[in-house]
Amino acid sequence: MLRTMLKSKIHRATVTQADLHYVGSCTIDADLMEAADILEGEQIDIVDIDNGNRLTTYAITGDRGTGVIGINGAAARLISPGDLVIIIGYAQYSEEDLKNYASRVVFVDGNNKQVELGGDPAQVPDGSGLKNPRHPEA
């Protein structure tokens, strides 16, 4: 049996551009793609924290060090520049693969620069003001 598990997450990135007239996809800074273990062409989900929209597309490598998070094509009708998003990649793992399973969770600042890298999907960075889903009362 294969299980579909979280593989990659870029948490609370800020959308820097959106253009209807691009080929559909999401352009992501190469540094963030590398940190999150996302490859060009890989299927990703994007969740818009500001409006609740969720969509599936694929990743395109953006210029390294620019912090670009670009929403391209029809998705630009659902997600706008300035919106906070979560970019998620999944993979299928066998029971054997799961013995060594760890996700890559990348937290970024307001300029989409990496501030923390972890492997726990429920991780909450210190001082972020976010709630831990395992301990919401804390």
UniProtKB/Swiss-Prot annotation:
Binds 1 pyruvoyl group covalently per subunit. The keyword Cytoplasm applies. Its cofactor is pyruvate. InterPro entries: Asp_de-COase-like_dom_sf, Asp_decarbox. Substrate binds at residues 57, 73-75. It is found in: Cytoplasm. Gene3D superfamilies: 2.40.40.20. GO terms for biological process: alanine biosynthetic process; pantothenate biosynthetic process. Is synthesized initially as an inactive proenzyme, which is activated by self-cleavage at a specific serine bond to produce a beta-subunit with a hydroxyl group at its C-terminus and an alpha-subunit with a pyruvoyl group at its N-terminus. One of its GO terms (molecular function) is aspartate 1-decarboxylase activity. Heterooctamer of four alpha and four beta subunits. This is Aspartate 1-decarboxylase. It comes from Corynebacterium jeikeium (strain K411).
